[in-house]
């Protein structure tokens, strides 16, 4: 908060020292109440408290046509509160709406024009936004993509001279071919879905949608038959459920390639995801709400809004969004219950959260395997390993012996047995998992680490760890494991090399820093060792057992050193 206040004082100084700023030559013409509300709005806006920011901005509307920075913050706050139409009206009614000084203002006006099917006006606003295309790396991509889209919507053909943005261009090509009903639409979606350079599984939904829209039901069924509920995303699980239940009309209710607004909406959703992946929650929600404005039918996309609010600690807002997912959307309803349980855990602790989820789970008739899987994971995370094993076993018994999903479930159940100290069953599950998938680095790591801790089959454990590290050399947990393995066989120089890398990869992990302290002690670097042990005590994630052991080590050092 102190830093925010300092930032505000700097802003105030700039306002009063600069002779010409924005549309207002001086702040003397504004009364103190307007300025107070405006600057309170800035503080709230900077602190990500958008609801309060909007209240303060609403109370200082006199600045609307006199100060550009106010217009930007006010319109942003409106969009973030999902008042997109109001934000558009504010911009349209500003005294100089053809000389706006921020890119997103023109995006709002373009969205308004698209909603009104006024493609010429949308193109005009897009051209005006050209001045901002180099402000950041996304603006140019957005500008060029919208230019291609508008050309296609107007002329019913694709633009010949267009920029190539790699995989984003492949996505755009698939949607534009779908819009134009091109014969090669199918191959475009398949090329996208099977692209080895990333996870494009979301677009399986749009491929299924395309097949159903063109009455190719059997092909749509063939696609969903290849999907597994456990390993599929929310959207694909819901899609499979609709196809399995012959609810084909549900697809057209939320998206159509024939609707240009739906296509632009999906592009904006992609941009929202890109911002979310960079932890820019504000920009992510801005583009997501703009996406929802263009296609309000696709309410399933709101799961990202809920997730963003949850990650930002805005739990009341998250719960409000989650409430739209009712039992009609089976998998999104379950997502809602899980997220509500996670919020309860944050507020009241794990026990109350798991009790809430268990009570909701008990009311679900014939829960599918994905729901059972999630419940098992909740129990495992809450250290109720007996219950976790019970639910993992229910799913494992129904799966084919060679299923990769079975391999993952055996890994999870084996880990639960290991935590209970039932090493025989743990080893059986973990070795069976490796029989199905011998190159799973995480199973190799888990089994090998367990053996090392038990002083069991040390040479074989080292071989497995070396294989795991070769497969995942930048994974901090695997790096820590192989470093700790060298520690256990008293090769402290090699151990230090790996654990140091693990600390660099995961600097706030209590176990890794504790391990590094132990190794430094063995290397007679005692002052540094105590530094890392003390650092672990300051970490919120350090459990009481680690803290207890470290307090002893700080005083006595490592025994038998």
What is each PLM-predicted segment?
Residues 17-74, 80, 88-89, 100-101, ...:
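N-terminal leader/linker segments that initiate helical-solenoid repeat arrays
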Residues 42, 76, 111, 149, ...:
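Residue-level recognition of tetratricopeptide repeat
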Residues 46, 80, 115, 153, ...:
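Register position in tetratricopeptide repeats
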Residues 54, 58, 84-97, 119-133, ...:
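Alpha-helical repeat scaffolds
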Residues 65, 99-100, 134, 164, ...:
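Short coil turns that delineate tetratricopeptide repeat
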Residues 70-71, 105, 139, 169, ...:
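TPR alpha-solenoid repeat register
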Residues 73, 108, 146, 172, ...:
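Canonical tetratricopeptide repeat
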Residues 255-265, 510, 515, 522-561:
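Terminal, low-structured helical/coil segments at or just beyond the last alpha-helical repeat
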């Amino acid at each position: 908060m102190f830093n925010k206040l300092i930032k505000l004082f700097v802003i105030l100084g700039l306002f009063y020292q600069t002779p010409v700023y924005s549309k207002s030559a001086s702040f003397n013409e504004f009364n103190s109440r307007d300025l107070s509300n405006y600057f309170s709005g800035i503080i709230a806006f900077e602190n990500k408290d958008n609801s309060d920011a909007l209240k303060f901005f609403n109370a200082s509307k006199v600045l609307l046509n006199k100060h550009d920075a106010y217009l930007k913050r006010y319109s942003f706050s409106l969009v973030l509160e999902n008042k997109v139409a109001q934000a558009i009206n504010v911009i349209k009614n500003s005294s100089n709406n053809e000389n706006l000084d921020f890119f997103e203002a023109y995006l709002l006006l373009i969205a308004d024009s698209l909603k009104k099917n006024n493609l010429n006006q949308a193109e005009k606003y897009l051209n005006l936004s050209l001045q901002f295309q180099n402000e950041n790396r996304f603006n140019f991509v957005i500008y060029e993509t919208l230019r291609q889209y508008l050309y296609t919507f107007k002329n019913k053909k694709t633009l010949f001279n267009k920029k190539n943005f790699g995989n984003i261009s492949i996505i755009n090509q698939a949607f534009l071919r779908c819009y134009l009903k091109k014969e090669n639409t199918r191959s475009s979606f398949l090329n996208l879905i099977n692209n080895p350079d990333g996870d494009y599984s979301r677009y399986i939904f749009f491929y299924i949608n395309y097949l159903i829209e063109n009455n190719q039901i059997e092909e749509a069924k063939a696609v969903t038959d290849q999907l597994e509920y456990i390993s599929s995303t929310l959207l694909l699980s819901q899609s499979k459920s609709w196809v399995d239940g012959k609810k084909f009309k549900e697809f057209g209710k939320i998206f159509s390639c024939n609707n240009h607004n739906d296509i632009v909406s999906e592009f904006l959703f992609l941009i929202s995801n890109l911002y979310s992946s960079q932890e820019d929650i504000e920009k992510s929600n801005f583009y997501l709400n703009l996406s929802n404005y263009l296609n309000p039918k696709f309410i399933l996309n709101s799961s990202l809004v809920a997730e963003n609010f949850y990650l930002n600690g805005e739990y009341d807002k998250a719960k409000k969004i989650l409430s739209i997912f009712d039992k009609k959307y089976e998998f999104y309803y379950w997502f809602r219950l899980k997220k509500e349980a996670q919020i309860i855990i944050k507020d009241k602790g794990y026990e109350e959260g798991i009790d809430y989820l268990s009570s909701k789970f008990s009311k679900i008739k014939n829960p599918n395997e994905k729901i059972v899987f999630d419940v098992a994971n909740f129990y495992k995370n809450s250290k109720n390993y007996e219950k976790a094993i019970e639910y993992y076993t229910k799913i494992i018994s129904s799966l084919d012996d060679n299923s990769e999903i079975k391999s993952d479930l055996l890994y999870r159940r084996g880990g639960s047995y290991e935590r209970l100290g039932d090493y025989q069953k743990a080893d059986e599950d973990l070795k069976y998992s490796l029989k199905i998938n011998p190159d799973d680095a995480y199973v190799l790591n888990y089994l090998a680490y367990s053996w090392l801790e038990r002083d069991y089959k040390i040479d074989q454990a080292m071989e497995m760890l070396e294989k795991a590290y070769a497969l995942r050399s930048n994974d901090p947990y695997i790096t820590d494991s192989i470093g700790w393995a060298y520690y256990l066989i008293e090769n402290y120089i090699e151990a230090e090399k790996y654990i140091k890398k693990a600390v660099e990869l995961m600097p706030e992990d209590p176990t890794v820093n504790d391990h590094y302290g132990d190794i430094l002690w063995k290397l007679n670097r005692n002052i540094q060792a105590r530094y890392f042990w003390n650092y672990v005590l300051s970490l919120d994630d350090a459990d009481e057992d680690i803290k207890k052991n470290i307090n002893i080590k700080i005083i006595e050092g490592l025994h038998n050193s």
